[in-house]
């Protein structure tokens, strides 16, 4: 993992020649985490948009009606086991001095998320811009993404799932209004 520890990992190999191939962990791990959270809560929704890696096409066309009762979004599409996105393409995902972040910060740190980064785009940015709510994007336990050496660390996926559960319990069903200031160079609206 990111700390150099040996952990149980999932990796894919080609059937025809036994060589490593990409596992698609950057998508699959995040989807798995969301499915686990859907089993733990009866008051949350999941949104699985298409074509994130070619311009967040699904999020750009997200149905406003679906998001009318959404108070915030948590995405699991950051690398490794200790990262989260502070901003995506220069667009901040939440206000640092907000109740949203103040309630969450300790929980985030307790789960080992200590590398807070400025990342390229992912769906949380588009949803925040489009629907004016605060978002997080957390590590999903995948490493060496988009390469034949990609792998997923099981313990890291479990930690991210537990992080999501703790945050949902703490943040509850409140609406955390946030309209990001879009960097005009990157704004999609």
List where the protein language model places each region.
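Acidic/His- and Gly-rich active-site-bordering loop/insert found
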Residues: 1-13
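A gly/proline- and charged-residue-enriched helix-loop-helix capping module
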Residues: 13-21
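Catalytic-loop motifs flanking and including active-site residues across diverse enzymes
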Residues: 26-33, 100, 123, 156, ...
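Zn-dependent metallopeptidase/amidohydrolase metal-coordination segment
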Residues: 115-160
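His/Asp/Glu-rich mid-to-C-terminal helical/loop segments that flank catalytic regions of hydrolases
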Residues: 144-189
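Generic secondary-structure signature for well-ordered alpha-helical cores
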Residues: 39-43, 52, 106-113, 129-132, ...
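Acidic/histidine-rich catalytic neighborhood of metal-dependent amide-processing enzymes
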Residues: 21-96, 116-117
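An extended, acidic, His-containing surface patch that forms the Zn2+-binding/catalytic region
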Residues: 87-131, 181
